[in-house]
From Swiss-Prot:
Catalytic activity: 4 hydroquinone + O2 = 4 benzosemiquinone + 2 H2O
Modes of activity regulation: Resistant to alkali and organic solvents such as methanol, ethanol and acetone. Resistant to EDTA, which might be explained by the spatial protection of copper ions in the active sites. Inhibited by DMSO. Strongly inhibited by Fe(2+) and DTT.
Protein EC: 1.10.3.2
Entry's cofactor comment: Binds 4 copper ions per subunit.
Entry note: thermal dependence: Thermostable. Optimum temperature is 70 degrees Celsius.
Cofactor(s) it depends on: Cu(2+)
Top EC class, one word: oxidoreductase
GO molecular function: copper ion binding; hydroquinone:oxygen oxidoreductase activity
Designated gene of the protein: cotA
Sites where the protein binds Cu cation 4: H419, C492, H497, M502
Domain called Plastocyanin-like: residue spans: 45-79, 99-174, 242-317, 372-506
Protein name: Laccase
Amino acid sequence: MNLEKFVDELPIPEVAEPVKKNPRQTYYEIAMEEVFLKVHRDLPPTKLWTYNGSLPGPTIKANRNEKVKVKWMNKLPLKHFLPVDHTIHAGHHDEPEVKTVVHLHGGVTPASSDGYPEAWFSRDFEATGPFFEREVYEYPNHQQACTLWYHDHAMALTRLNVYAGLAGFYLISDAFEKSLELPKDEYDIPLMIMDRTFQEDGALFYPSRPNNTPEDSDLPDPSIVPFFCGETILVNGKVWPYLEVEPRKYRFRILNASNTRTYELHLDNDATILQIGSDGGFLPRPVHHQSFSIAPAERFDVIIDFSAYENKTIVLKNSAGCGQDVNPETDANIMQFKVTRPLKGRAAKTLRPIFKPLPPLRPSRADNERTLTLTGTQDKYGRPILLLDNQFWNDPVTENPRLGSVEVWNIVNPTRGTHPIHLHLVQFRVIDRRPFDTDIYQSTGEIVYTGPNEAPPLHEQGYKDTIQAHAGEVIRIIARFVPYSGRYVWHCHILEHEDYDMMRPMDIIQ
């Protein structure tokens, strides 16, 4: 649907208000609710599933080492309004159709509060999954300042629940961040980017079968689809919004919350975007971009300087297609900045943040090394199933790092596409990438490299929890598995892949 662009103002997510707060802890109650919200001036209200009635949900702000507790409450209907495939793993008919569980993405969190897919719960906790342990989640927030996000992670339903609107920001701050000369308060804005398809009545559309499925196909109906690309782009819950800004520097925390789509972002006036942080916090030094690629679940913490563009408009654009070439009338556009607000007070002319260097990588000193391959097969209906190391979700656990150990993971991607790989619990670092011959690999299983090791680009040299594993490459990452033991997961963050079956349990053992 080609709606008029830049007619709705960008909403700024509200900050969550705690129910209780004392020196020992901060306690929130956040409900998942079905609401109807206006996403565009010319559309009727859209049915959405939200946290506390808004998309994005309320932003939780925490200081480092502040203990936060959240009671996530499912107040959703008993029937899903998007097409549920009961044939994929854990889609059992004897379980509630609507299941939820919340994962703090990038959070270093005890296993019982991590949002394990089988720790799901139904409305008012009437039914719970086999790994359910607690109604109130605990977040210690021992991490450095970083931009995290929370979203649904229910088994076999993540793609639908997140598409319905279950996502929000979680920001951790610390004394080091506060010492930097960065834009703050109203000049520090989170941007949640997602793609959707709408019907004429404003309803969300999500396909019930893969494209070009014959009418007489024996595929289940509904059936999971291998990917989803919407032609309409939302930022903070509005379609192609605009933001009025002052001629000064702004900090934007950009999150790709799309199911499948990777964006290649740039400004239409070719202005430089200064990146200061990635998934797990600040980079060792700032990086200047003319454009950058951001895959599902990745975060880019950036500064845009509008001081030279008073009374001008600038459009944040996307040059990456999704299943087809980008359309200049639709998905090539993200949002518009109008530099029309008068400058309030004094704005810093330059930024002089002194960032901390990260410790050197020492892969040779790792306690263990694993080689893990992104693979796939077909189910009995001929549908693709993407896998991690040829293992299904229900197969025995094979990734079992010892608590406190350092491991190197060699992630081999012989598939034809990029997969954003996410590890729970840890913030890892990228060692290098190396291209290999996928044809030889597919025929013999042998990895024959076609080029040298390539150091990660500057923007990937910080702490990451999600990394783009490109086709025809081996990417090496290194992580220390601390500070909690227990059951976690790692998976592809293309949600249609994660739900079937590109996700594996991971046990951190004592």
